[in-house]
């Protein structure tokens, strides 16, 4: 009888723990205004709505499952999803562009992408060094190159090509106004390949090492933006520059110092990865 009681208690404990685990999904920030005309509308992965009087720009659509989250968040903020006129992306990995096809079907928005990432979107296949899961193929209405401009309703974003994480990874740069002041804002593209990706003689991205080194040098040469918006939750655990008028719960927000520190870490880690890969040749 005692043994039976033990098993009953153990089974109950397992059921309780299972209930707790499944009942507590990861909590992500509600939709909110970041700064100026930039809003967070993402969920598990980053997605930003840049609003203008003539329609809106959506940066990244996340995974397929995140589509409904974005649609709901846009509505919660008081905007119409149908007013999204342009879709851009940080880079063509599934967790950032898998929702492009559904969003284009819903809104009719123009899809804009750079070089190799445009090819990935058109094919519905990841062509980065990692060869990750793909996405539903979507027509790219405008294929851009480094330095090109995307403009809508008085808002201008400039594309900075940063290959390495993907072939067409793009940092988008703009300026916003908040409280009568101008702030430079950059949206992360992707600096380095994912950990564990083959770097030597990679069949998908043969120049991944050279491209990544170029990207790191380009980003280091930039004047650090006032605000750098990451495309993943970072839980940075450090306060933002007090001069930045940004909500403290924005865990994708990085100030100029955090941006510089991130680049230093990325360069150090990538240098070590290349050294290890070359040692195994």
Predicted regions and their residues:
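Conserved beta-strand hairpin/beta-sheet module of binuclear metal-dependent hydrolase folds
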Residues: 28-77, 172-193, 198
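Positively charged n-region of N-terminal signal peptides that target proteins for export
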Residues: 1-6
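Active-site environment of divalent metal-dependent phosphoester hydrolases
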Residues: 66, 92-98, 118-121, 167-170, ...
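Accessory terminal helices/loops
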Residues: 19-25, 179, 193-281
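Bacterial N-terminal signal peptides
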Residues: 7-19
